[in-house]
Amino acid sequence: MKRNNIKKARMEQSRRPKKNPLKAAGIEKVDYKDINTLRQFISDRHKIRSRRVTGLTPQQQRQVATAVKNAREMALLPFTSR
């Protein structure tokens, strides 16, 4: 086997799907007023984390993004860090 093939095979073996945090918490619909839940999906620079990092489904990621944007508009979450 070539070196690249060995490296690729190792990476495929070590890759695991992330646990879905919303499913684990039993949350079906994301609410913009639930700040503690939304903070899990925001980085330290207050950017919305990607699906790859959070382990959400595409539909849940859209719900989280909309909820974070609504919470920012309602001044429940800051737009940026200081």
UniProtKB/Swiss-Prot annotation:
Molecular function per GO: small ribosomal subunit rRNA binding; structural constituent of ribosome
Bridged cysteine pairs (disulfide): none
Domain of life: Bacteria
Region feature Disordered, mapped onto this chain: 1-23
UniProt keyword annotations, A-Z: Ribonucleoprotein, Ribosomal protein, RNA-binding, rRNA-binding
GO terms for cellular component: cytosolic small ribosomal subunit
Annotated Pfam families: Ribosomal_S18 (PF01084)
GO terms under biological process: translation
NCBIfam families from the UniProt entry: S18
HAMAP family per UniProt: Ribosomal_bS18
Family of the protein in this entry: Belongs to the bacterial ribosomal protein bS18 family.
The protein's role, per its UniProt record: Binds as a heterodimer with protein bS6 to the central domain of the 16S rRNA, where it helps stabilize the platform of the 30S subunit.
Assembly description: Part of the 30S ribosomal subunit. Forms a tight heterodimer with protein bS6.
PANTHER family: 30S RIBOSOMAL PROTEIN S18 (PTHR13479), SMALL RIBOSOMAL SUBUNIT PROTEIN BS18M (PTHR13479:SF40)
Protein name: Small ribosomal subunit protein bS18
Gene: rpsR
